[in-house]
Amino acid sequence: MITLKEALKYSKEELENLKKELNEKAKKEKKLGAYIEQFLDKDLSVSGEGVPVAIKDNISVKGWELTSASKILQGYIAPYDASAIVNLKANGFAPFGRCNMDEFAMGSSTASSCYGKTLNPLNFERVPGGSSGGSAAAVAGGLALASLGSDTGGSVRQPAAFCGCVGFKPSYGRVSRYGLASYSSSLDQIGVLTQNVEDAAILYDAIAGYDKMDSTSANIEFIKTAPNLNANEKLKIAVIENYVNDADTEVKNALLKTIDMLKANGHEIVYKNLLDSKFDIAAYYIIATAEASANLSRYDGVRYGKRSENIQNLKEMYVNTRSEGFGEEVKRRILLGTFVLSSGYYDAYYIKAQKARAFIKAKYEEILQDCDLIFMPVTPTMAFKFDTQKSPMQTYLEDVYTISVNLAGLGGISVPVAKDKEGLNISAQLICKAYDEQTLLDGALSLEQMIKN
């Protein structure tokens, strides 16, 4: 598969041929389930001219159906382009194909989609991760040059690690959320999934920047990263020792070898510890579900999306529409969020979680005052099998090493570093100071080149 960098040099005719080739591949690989539209006998949606980039089903593209992989939004046509899509088109790219996802971005396996599950291109018995599993599977499976996803607690980095591609979540506010279907407004961030680090920088440069349409957009200077990439920069990297040691044996061993390579290549390695990850899990799921319960209250059968036909009055319309339209995981999180915001529990849970969030952020900032980057696992395990019986709590633990990055509002990237004997991917995660994506991408490029060599 050609890279984004190479495709940007293509003529208009060559790009049209590339899109036809990707269409044919997508139709042949329907079983993978990376694209939502691939179960239909028609071409993938395309919007505008340019290098094709696959788009997650929660990012608005004018004229395209946007469902967040939920029955409740089926039939809703986006009336405008998300700001990230506007920027994408302005920089020579074209939205191309809707990628499958966990319903409303709530999940770690892309198994909760109303369209059916997505498979891992490395092993069809394994999950691709989530919630941007379709975006990761499309890139890793050779059905897309690159894709856009969203990352609320690891939803770009974790599927990238499971499928074996690069997943990059910028700092909170660096890419506009205008036009992104909200899950948790203080945590959501659009990110990129690509074949390599340089492509991640190119695609990030195309979508990043201040946007007056998003009140949480960071109004600070943005300098393009791709032209300034430097893999030779020697960095001080903090290894989170307790997280590396707590990972499964194969993941731990691969990361220890990677740390040795970083040392051998002239990077300064120091060892630090972060809080027990159980605090991250508790704070994240209280804050995320509380915000989700408010954000998803708009789906009531009145304004847009599906409306239940089994109704006698207004109350039944609300109750039946939401009961029929939402999947089990979404209902679970709405109920949890409503509970923690209810009278008598708000102070006990929500306020306490916000205090824990501030403490988590302060701990990251303390380490990054003295270091350029942080190094730790993306996930504690490799991609698990679909038939693995996991409780909701066990599934939530798949994001144990990624959610704190969102709580702190920092940038993070997942870079493949090893394969196990079955060919499953193992990735390392690098984390930067807020808005220091240049250093993050420099470090990631250095790591990538080390592994390739």
UniProtKB/Swiss-Prot annotation:
Gene Ontology MF terms:
ATP binding; glutaminyl-tRNA synthase (glutamine-hydrolyzing) activity
Q: Where is the active site?
A: K56, S131, S155
EC numbers: 6.3.5.7
Q: What is an example of a Pfam family matching this protein?
A: Amidase
Name of this chain's protein: Glutamyl-tRNA(Gln) amidotransferase subunit A
Asked if the keyword Ligase belongs to this entry, the reply reads: yes
Q: Does the keyword Transcription regulation apply?
A: no
Question: Which InterPro entries does this chain map to?
Answer: Amidase, Amidase_CS, Amidase_dom, AS_sf, GatA
The EC class name is ligase
Task: Name a GO CC annotation attached to this entry.
Answer: glutamyl-tRNA(Gln) amidotransferase complex
Q: Which SUPFAM superfamilies match?
A: Amidase signature (AS) enzymes
Ranked from the top, the taxonomy reads: Bacteria, Pseudomonadati, Campylobacterota, Epsilonproteobacteria, Campylobacterales
Q: What does this protein do?
A: Allows the formation of correctly charged Gln-tRNA(Gln) through the transamidation of misacylated Glu-tRNA(Gln) in organisms which lack glutaminyl-tRNA synthetase. The reaction takes place in the presence of glutamine and ATP through an activated gamma-phospho-Glu-tRNA(Gln).
Q: Which UniProt keywords apply?
A: ATP-binding, Ligase, Nucleotide-binding, Protein biosynthesis
Complex and partners: Heterotrimer of A, B and C subunits.
Q: Which reaction is the catalytic activity of this chain?
A: L-glutamyl-tRNA(Gln) + L-glutamine + ATP + H2O = L-glutaminyl-tRNA(Gln) + L-glutamate + ADP + phosphate + H(+)
One GO biological-process annotation of the entry reads: translation
